[in-house]
Regions:
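Metal-dependent phosphohydrolase cores
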Residues: 1-204
Length: 204
C-alpha cells in the first residue's frame, strides 16, 4: 500500500515524463487519467504489486530504473567506448515504451468484489465488461492509437512483448524488445521476493 499523497505524486511525475518524452495525450488523461492513476500493476497480493496506484509506482520506481541501468551499465559507454553497440537501445525510446506499456491495466483490472477470491490473495480481478479479449500489450497499443500517441515500429513491437510466451531465442528480435522483456521479468522477481521477505519479517 502507498499513501494517497504518494499516488498523486507518482501520477504528477508520470505525466511530466510523458510530456518530456513526447508521448503525452491530453485526451488520454481527461478520459481515463483517474483510472490510470489508481490502477494496479498486478492482480495477486503475492506478486508484491497488487495495490491501488501500483501500476505507475512500479513503472516509475522499478521498471524504468532497472531497464535504464541495464541499458547504460551493461550495454552503455565505458571510458568513452560503447561496450556493445549492437545491443544498446535509444534511451528515449526505451523510457517512452516503459511509461506506456501497462496503461491497459487501468481498464483491464478492477478491485476485487468476491470475498472468497480476496481471501485467496486476489485483490484485483479482470474487468468482465471488456468488449474484447485483447491482451495487455495489445490493448495498450490500441489505447495509444485511440488517443493519438505515435509509436515507432520498434516501440509497437516492444509494448506487445509482454503478451508473448517464452520461445526459442530469435536473433531477429530487437534489442529494445529483449531489454523490455528482461526488465519486466526482473521487476516481477524483485517485487515477489521483497513481498515474501516482508511477510516473513511481519510474522516474527
Amino acid at each position: 500500500m502507498i499513501s494517497e499523497e504518494k499516488i498523486n505524486l507518482n501520477y504528477t511525475r508520470w505525466i511530466e515524463r510523458l510530456k518530456h518524452y513526447d508521448c503525452y495525450s491530453e485526451r488520454l488523461i481527461d478520459e481515463i487519467g483517474d483510472k490510470i492513476k489508481n490502477a494496479s500493476f498486478s492482480l495477486q497480493e503475492s506478486s508484491g504489486a497488487a495495490y491501488q496506484g501500483s501500476m505507475i509506482d512500479v513503472v516509475l520506481n522499478n521498471l524504468c530504473v532497472i531497464a535504464c541501468h541495464l541499458n547504460s551499465l551493461a550495454f552503455g559507454v565505458n571510458k568513452d567506448k560503447v561496450l556493445h553497440p549492437y545491443l544498446q537501445v535509444n534511451q528515449n525510446s526505451l523510457i517512452r515504451e516503459l511509461l506506456l506499456q501497462h496503461i491497459a491495466k487501468a481498464e483491464m483490472f478492477i478491485l476485487q468484489t468476491n470475498q472468497w477470491k480476496a481471501k485467496q490473495g486476489y485483490l484485483f480481478d479482470f474487468n468482465p465488461n471488456m468488449n474484447t479479449c485483447l491482451k495487455c500489450g495489445e490493448r495498450t497499443t490500441f489505447l495509444c492509437m485511440k488517443y493519438g500517441i505515435e509509436l515507432t515500429e520498434e516501440e509497437f513491437e516492444a509494448i506487445r512483448i509482454i503478451d508473448k510466451e517464452d520461445s526459442v531465442a530469435n536473433q531477429y528480435i530487437t534489442p529494445l524488445c529483449q531489454l523490455v522483456k528482461m526488465a519486466n521479468q526482473l521487476v516481477s522477481i524483485e517485487l515477489y521476493r521483497k513481498h515474501k521477505e516482508q511477510n516473513k519479517e511481519n510474522n516474527y
